[in-house]
């Protein structure tokens, strides 16, 4: 079979089967891959310093690619599971008949010699997959699910249910966006019907973040959540390749950095969002459960009307796994909340967040998209409506003005509340009718007591720090003392 026929017979990217033995491990050859599109073979090339991993079907750093000699993807055999003749009833069979404990299958670690324990692990094949929702067993305050995912907690009718709106912002907090936060959106004069200032949830990443500003946001009552240390690429790394240890290093590591240099208390870190909305399958959620995270805010649901309510992961998700690079959890993670993202619809276009909507949006486009999608929530089941923003997206002044206009208009309604994810979960755990919300304790705006070191300082330290990993000096602003080196993975406190 010649070169073209090999490519045409495959539906996924492959390497050149006719490449010479001498060139197999060269950077140039290992970075190439070929794909058949409409009966024609096209050559592609990974970006500079990246190689193509034929098994993972992505470009990655040289040190992570170990299969330059392979021409096509290695197919993993299907495990025998309960078809194997295992002597122990709690064991299942690998493809080669080897019996292992059932919990070893689809746990993120390779245990079968033939790798079959991790090769067939979507929701249809995982032998340890979560069961379908059972509302009789899943009871508030610790568990919430419904058959189709759209039912209101506490069986409240829409007119009794507050329309919660969640403003969430991903990325670094610094001088480039501080004016938008402190002087444009959260000035203190925009207030919910109970008299409390509107609040947002900030998913903070590490590089370029001013930790004094993070500390001030926390002092002002906003929720601080985690968005990783590195924001590394490629996007598929998070969903396909990150180990449980990687998840711990990235997310718990960032919590440690914010705690040390932004003084945010560890018990206040409730949730996280994965970069690029690349859900990390069971490995991500195993780490979250072990560390004590309360919620994830990464999963994008399909567009439905009425929209989905948040749910706990005690049972199977009420919708299919949607969006790019989404490898949703298949197992049960009791008590862990999924603050599901309901996508936005604009004409025939569906986008997970405003950042993924058409780049030629005008100020009026942004406003109309938000208003039309808000009505789908407000006039139906009143599932929380999310305005999910990216720090870079807000640099567009027209977009910022559209957001401000939308917020101002909605605050005229007597049953609309701009709240944090933590406050959404507080309400779902104790569904409270609109007319009783002025006395709903979790939403009160009582002054919080801070230690002197927890209060954002007027004159923070600007630290110039060496970084062996990044190979150049980095600046970091903090009210705490400067560390010796730039904080990074496995060196969160900058000791080394």
Give residue spans per PLM region.
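Aromatic-lined glycan-binding groove of carbohydrate-active enzymes
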Residues: 288, 312-369, 373-377
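Extracellular/luminal ectodomains of secreted and membrane glycoproteins with large N-terminal domains
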Residues: 27, 57, 102, 106, ...
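N-linked glycosylation sites
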Residues: 64-67, 88, 148, 241, ...
